């Protein structure tokens, strides 16, 4: 609303200013001159537009002439293009079959290279697994050595416990002897108590003290007997643990030996597979070279085959022309024979033939025989040439088919060897998985034995305390 109010004020101020100056003389003069200024500018613009129209018209005529010239060139170029397209199409039709065969051979080669690459990747995976297995083998050997060290420490601890047991047994024996002596003293004191009970009241107090002492010694005896039983139980437990550890140790050593033998067998299998893979790669490279040579030979044979086919077609055309000429000569001979017979009949009717006519007849007959022999020789020569070319063509086709069959047999052999190689790789993979499982089981048994040894060690420390 404020903006609209400001705008109204500005408009009102402009109108007020215009009404104030419109009656001035110079403003009236301006109003009269302004239309004249516009008409002068319009005439200048019209002259400029006419000049521009002339230039544009001249440019248009030049462009039209140039367009016609380009259209004529375009027609000629289109004609040449169509001719070239026809030639290219003809050449392309001739090359399609050869390109299809080459493409098929290239596809086969690419497939073989892909299969070789896949085998190489699998071999690299097997090598990585073998390296991991070797590292795990070293780790297992280290763990076995540590376990052996723990077993030796446990044996030293058992020997120490044996010594402590003997010392405890000696203490128990001494306490037993003391208890026997105390029993004798108690019996003696009891007898003295019964005999001197009335006379020795003070002795009763001493006897009560002695009984308290005996009770204390009895409790000590029971405690020592309990300790002896605990030590004997611990000793039996330690013996059992030692026997279990010995059995586990022997089992681990046997499993370790079997694992080492399996690893050696796998390394030998791996080395053999690597050698076979190198041999296969060499065979494949030779086969690729042979395939390239065969492809070049196939191209040469195809080129030669096309040349022979073209030559056969030319010879067949010549033979057909010779046959046509022979038919014409035969027709001419029959016409001449018929004419000769008619002449002979006329001469006979005329009453005889002159010597000139006889010579002419002989000359015609000789020329006819010569033409006939030349025609037969040419026909035989053309037929022999055509037969030789057909035989050569058949031999080339047979040779090409034999080479293709050889390539197919080599391909089937490689496919079979590839399948066998894949089965061997599967066997090696299965063996590696079994060894990994066996290793995991050994690690589990080792951890269990280590936990048991720690538990027994803790019990021994508690028993010693």
Curated annotation (Swiss-Prot):
Tagged with keyword Hydrolase: no
Record PTM Phosphoserine, positions in chain: 285, 334
Main localization category: cytoplasm
Signal sequence, start to end: none
GO annotation, cellular component aspect: myofibril; myosin filament; myosin II complex
Gene Ontology molecular function: actin filament binding; ATP binding; microfilament motor activity
Positions carrying Phosphotyrosine: 456
SS bond partners: none
Residue ranges of domain Myosin motor in the record: 1-35
Subunit (UniProt): Muscle myosin is a hexameric protein that consists of 2 heavy chain subunits (MHC), 2 alkali light chain subunits (MLC) and 2 regulatory light chain subunits (MLC-2).
Function: Muscle contraction.
Domain free text: The rodlike tail sequence is highly repetitive, showing cycles of a 28-residue repeat pattern composed of 4 heptapeptides, characteristic for alpha-helical coiled coils. Limited proteolysis of myosin heavy chain produces 1 light meromyosin (LMM) and 1 heavy meromyosin (HMM). HMM can be further cleaved into 2 globular subfragments (S1) and 1 rod-shaped subfragment (S2).
The protein's name: Myosin-6
Organism: Oryctolagus cuniculus
Highest classification ranks of the organism: Eukaryota, Metazoa, Chordata, Craniata, Vertebrata
């Amino acid at each position: 609303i404020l903006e609209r109010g400001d705008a109204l004020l500005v408009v009102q101020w402009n109108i007020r200013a215009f009404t104030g100056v419109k009656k001035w003389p110079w403003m009236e003069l301006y109003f009269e001159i302004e239309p004249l200024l516009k008409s002068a500018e319009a005439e200048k613009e019209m002259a400029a537009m006419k000049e521009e129209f002339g230039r544009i018209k001249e440019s248009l005529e030049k462009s039209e002439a140039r367009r016609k010239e380009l259209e004529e060139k375009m027609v000629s170029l289109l004609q040449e293009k169509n001719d070239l397209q026809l030639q290219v199409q003809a050449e392309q039709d001739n090359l399609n079959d050869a390109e299809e065969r080459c493409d098929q051979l290239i596809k086969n080669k690419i497939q073989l290279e892909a299969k070789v690459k896949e085998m190489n990747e699998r071999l690299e995976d097997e090598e990585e697994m073998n390296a991991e297995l070797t590292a795990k083998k070293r780790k297992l050997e280290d763990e076995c050595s540590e376990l052996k060290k723990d077993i030796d420490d446990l044996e030293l601890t058992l020997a120490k416990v044996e010594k402590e047991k003997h010392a405890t047994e000696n203490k128990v024996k001494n306490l037993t002897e003391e208890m026997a002596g105390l029993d004798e003293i108690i019996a003696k004191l009891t007898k003295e108590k019964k005999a001197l009970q009335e006379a020795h009241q003070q002795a009763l107090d001493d006897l009560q003290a002695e009984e308290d002492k005996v009770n204390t010694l009895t409790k000590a005896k029971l405690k020592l007997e309990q300790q002896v039983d605990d030590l004997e139980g611990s000793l039996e437990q330690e013996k059992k643990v030692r026997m279990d550890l010995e059995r586990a140790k022997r089992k681990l050593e046997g499993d370790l030996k079997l694992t080492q033998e399996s690893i050696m067998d796998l390394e030998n299998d791996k080395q053999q597979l690597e050698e076979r893979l190198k041999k296969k790669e060499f065979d494949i490279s030779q086969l690729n070279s042979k395939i390239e040579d065969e492809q070049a030979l196939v191209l040469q044979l195809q080129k030669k085959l096309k040349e022979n086919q073209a030559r056969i077609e030319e010879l067949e055309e010549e033979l057909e022309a010779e046959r046509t000429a022979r038919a014409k000569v035969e027709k001419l001979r029959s016409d001449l024979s018929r004419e000769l017979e008619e002449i002979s009949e006329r001469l006979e009717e005329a009453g005889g033939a002159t010597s000139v006519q006889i010579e002419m007849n002989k000359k015609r007959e000789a020329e006819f025989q010569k033409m006939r022999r030349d025609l037969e020789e040419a026909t035989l020569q053309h037929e022999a040439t055509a037969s030789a070319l057909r035989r050569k063509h058949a031999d080339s086709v047979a040779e090409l088919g034999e080479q293709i069959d050889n390539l197919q047999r080599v391909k089937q052999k490689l496919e079979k060897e590839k399948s066998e190689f894949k089965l061997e790789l599967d066997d090696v993979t299965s063996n590696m998985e079994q060894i990994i499982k066996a290793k995991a089981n050994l690690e589990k048994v080792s951890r269990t034995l280590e936990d048991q040894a720690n538990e027994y060690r803790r019990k021994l420390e508690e028993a010693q305390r």
